[in-house]
Amino acid sequence: MNLYNAVVTAAAKESKDKGVLVAMNGLILGAQSTVKMNTVDVQTFQAPNSGALGYVLNGKVFYNQVTLKKHTTQSVFDVTHLNALPKVGIVYSYSNIEADMVTPMLNNGYKGIIHAGVGNGNIHQNIFPVLTDARQKGILVVRSSRVPTGPTTLDAE
């Protein structure tokens, strides 16, 4: 049924200009908001921060809301002039993480480091100086959270 609903959604004139969509379990989700919430659950794909955009019923699509985020060709991520994506590392942080888990990224051609922290994207004191050093070397550092919903806030450390 998911494949059928996906085809119905893609073919529907109502889906035009809605960006990339996910049609699963009778729902229509915006791809930017879709998260896999469970390792084995059949209804694992959800949009916990925004909810479903609509649903498919009896071969017809019904939209309840629209996405306000820029998407597809209007996205802020323009990669049309890139020949290759930059080398970016992801640090899955945890309590008492050691600096040597991050230090190799500073001298091996990384252009960015994504810090996937606990809670509000918290950075453990052991690696804070290494990430500061990375910034001083021109490496972009992004603080994120492994928690599937909610933002990371400024000045959380």
Question: Model-found features: residue ranges?
Answer:
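Accessory alpha-helical/coil subdomains and C-terminal extensions
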Residues: 30-115, 120
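Short, glycine/serine-rich, charged loops/turns that create anion-binding
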Residues: 27, 95, 148
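Predominant activation on well-ordered alpha-helical scaffold segments within soluble catalytic domains
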Residues: 4-11, 54, 128, 132
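C-terminal non-catalytic interaction/assembly regions of soluble proteins
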Residues: 120-157
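Short beta-strand segments
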Residues: 21-25, 92, 116, 144-145
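Short coil/turn connectors at secondary-structure junctions
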Residues: 14-19, 24-25, 49-50, 85-88, ...
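Short, glycine/charged-enriched secondary-structure capping and boundary segments
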Residues: 1-3, 35-38, 105, 128-130, ...
